[in-house]
Amino acid sequence: MYRLTSKLVIYRNIGKDSILFKLADIFQRFSTGQYVKEDLITEIYDQIHNLLDLSTRYGFDKNLWHNYLAFLLAMSENPFTLVSEKVGANEGTVNEFAKGDFAIFKQLFDYDFSAIEKELGIDCFSVVLNYKAIVKSEQIFNKSVSEKVQQLSTDIEKAEDESEMYKIVTDFYRTYGVGKFGLNKAFRVNHNENTRQAGEILEPITTTGNMSLDDLIGYESQKQKLIENTEAFVKGKKANNVLLFGDAGTGKSTSIKAILNKYYSQGLRMIEVYKHEFKDLSTIISEIKNRNYRFIIYMDDLSFEEFEIEYKCLKAVIAGGLETKPDNSLIYATSHRRHLI
């Protein structure tokens, strides 16, 4: 396995701390014979534990090894995958490196674990290759991510070679995107700097609800204006920031969440930002401005007191500072205070 992972080029950014690279290191030591059996088994079980933990988090089932490899491909943001997200399969020398990596992943998909299991007297790899997950509520894991990754895994299983796998994966990138923005609908600010990736401030919201505009009775003209504005936005046409105002319980927040569900498949994403997080708006915009999605920055129950100054950060984004708000983002806010207009 180490001989395979060491040759990765495009997907080398998967990282040495990943399950894949940890297992590759274990298999390298196994191949040399320079190991303590009990210690090696312990290290293998550590990675199996990590695999089970990830699989539970994302609701994976059946072949967890294949699902994990598909997950790596779906989440790996690099120059090749980000370009594929925008244009799909494309001409260029980089494709030779990509196909080389896909040939490696194809071998990893077909990897034979029987030798190490026989030598160490374990069967954990056989178990995860034929896994039956406990039925879980969809509230426990992100169903959207789970279904996409498992379908990608199934499609790769059927690929004959790296060229076919190249088409499958690049089509996936073009259809769904790559990384957290490709696989998730909604996001929030992550205040824990220890869990942030470099240059990233947003984390996925894994449960967003399945509300629909049809669930709201009345307000037909308002809903139609919201639909028309959002539809223009996702199509790259001129659209406006939106303020929904009215009494509590009139469906303002539900309308915006329903809009996300309606246009998610067309590339719409939503970022929930609270008033105390307005200072982070410029950082948020820096993270999303070059991505091939349309982002609604969602502010719920917006209001300001006379002594509060957070509105200045919002005003700078709307009015435009040195770095203007990019064309792929709009602000949708709700409030019970009409004077905010």
Model-derived regions: residue spans:
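Phosphate-binding P-loop
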Residues: 204-207, 231-239
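Intrinsically disordered, low-complexity N-terminal extensions of AAA+/P-loop NTPases
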Residues: 1-157
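Walker A/P-loop
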Residues: 241-272, 283-289
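Interdomain "pre-motor" coupling segment immediately N-terminal to P-loop NTPase/helicase cores
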Residues: 133-202
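Walker B catalytic acidic pair
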Residues: 300-302
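Conserved catalytic/switch belt of AAA+ P-loop NTPases
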Residues: 286-290, 305-341
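Dynamic helix-loop-helix/coil hinge segments at AAA+ ATPase domain boundaries and subdomain interfaces
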Residues: 156, 201-224
